[in-house]
Each structure stands twice: as C-alpha cells, then as structure tokens.
C-alpha cells in the first residue's frame, strides 16, 4: 500500500526504512493516540462529498504544491489532479512507479521539487 507492487518500488521502500532507522539522534517523537484518532477521522471524512469544501479549496490564492504517486491506493491520483485543478496556482507532480510512500521512494527528487517550488 505504501509502495507500488514493482520490484523496484519495493526495494526503494526497504531502502527508505533503512534510512529512517539508521538515524539515531534527533528523531521525531511518536505521535499520540489523539493524533492518530484525528488522522483516522480526517481520512474517513475525506470520502464524504462536501461541495462547500471544494469551494473553499478553490479560494486558495497562494501557490500550492500537490504531489502523489501514480499508483497510490489510499489517495487515488485522480484526486490529486482534481485538487490541483481546483487551486488556481497549484503545481502538480505525479511520481512514477510509486504509491503513498512516493516521497520516501523518490526522496531526492521530491526534496529538489519542494526546494524549487519554495524558491
């Protein structure tokens, strides 16, 4: 689910985990149960049609970087296209052979894309 089914994507996932666990200092704190519940509630609410939310998204005036993997089963790429199409100054990037963990799989490219976007 986090990485695409291809051998290359699965290998990139293993490498990402290796990078994460190699770091011994300055690691992020574990999230709280309340944080996890809030995330779950947000994911559940995402599937409920809300035209008012779409109108609010369309009112965003600042530049927005929308990114996703082309094989993401959690947030389907079509929703990334929809979101980017609704935000006037959105920039969309879909990473190939990647799922929900695209930013870990394509970490260097994603970091460069974010840096370029923020420049």
Give the positions of each predicted feature.
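Short acidic active-site motifs
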Residues: 52-56, 106
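Short beta-strand/loop motif that positions the catalytic acidic residue
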Residues: 60, 66-68, 72
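Hydrophobic, aromatic-rich cap/lid helix
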Residues: 27-53
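Catalytic active-site module of serine/aspartate enzymes centered on a nucleophile-bearing elbow/loop
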Residues: 89-119
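Helix-rich cap/lid subdomain of alpha/beta-hydrolase
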Residues: 1-27
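Conserved alpha/beta-hydrolase "acid-adjacent" motif
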Residues: 73-79
């Amino acid at each position: 689910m986090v990485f695409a089914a291809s051998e290359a994507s699965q290998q990139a996932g293993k490498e990402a985990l290796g990078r994460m666990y190699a770091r011994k200092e300055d690691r992020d704190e574990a999230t709280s149960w309340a944080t996890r519940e809030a995330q779950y509630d947000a994911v559940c609410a995402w599937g409920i049609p809300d035209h008012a939310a779409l109108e609010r998204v369309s009112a965003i005036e600042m530049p927005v970087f929308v990114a996703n993997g082309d094989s993401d089963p959690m947030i389907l790429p079509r929703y990334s296209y929809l979101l980017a199409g609704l935000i006037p100054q959105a920039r969309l990037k879909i990473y190939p052979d990647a799922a929900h963990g695209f930013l870990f799989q394509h970490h260097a490219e994603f970091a460069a894309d974010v840096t370029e976007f923020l420049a």
